[in-house]
Amino acid sequence: IAPAGEMAATAAETIIGSVAHALQSEADDERPIISGELPIGGHRFEGLLPPVVASPTFTIRRRASRLLPLDDYIADKVMTEAQATVIRSAIANRLNIVIAGGTGSGKTTLANAVIAEIIASAPDDRMVILEDTAEIRCAAENAVCLHTSDTIDMARLLKSTMRLRPDRIIVGEVRDGAALTLLKAWNTGHPGGVTTV
């Protein structure tokens, strides 16, 4: 990551407060963490205020500008043809796919490529997509997107998903206790899903 420059703490706090307001939330000592999607561009925002940090800080993570299909991964030598074949076979056999990696490693970009392959091979499947921040790109005609909020967590969305008759459950990023709920959903008649960890 290249240095982005310097900013006065008061300016950073003002930006975090403005983003919180745009997200219909508050940023203060009692609610010092703001996470969400910027209203313009849909980029991810994470802002932190004291007391969880010494000085106000925030990060903006840009969305990928375009969808990278699996064939581009092969052409760019990011993955081999054999690896792409394994992914395509997993999709065809309705196996669940878990994509793991560090922050900024391209998990969501790869998940979007996998989802595009699912749509190409099973265009009639009903996709239910759950996310904290809208990052999944899904061109399926029969897709329902659910988002967490301050009062609705991922585990609650997963429970609701079971009543939406999904063919495939896709979770943008699963963590904590929601992972067990997702595994139970996948193992009770909803195979062929995708998630990142």
Tell where the protein language model's regions lie, with residue ranges.
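P-loop NTP-binding catalytic core
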Residues: 2-93
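Switch/coupling sub-region of P-loop NTPases
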Residues: 84, 94-100, 109, 113-197
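P-loop (Walker A) phosphate-binding loop of NTP-binding proteins
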Residues: 90, 102-103
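Conserved glycine(s) of the Walker
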Residues: 106
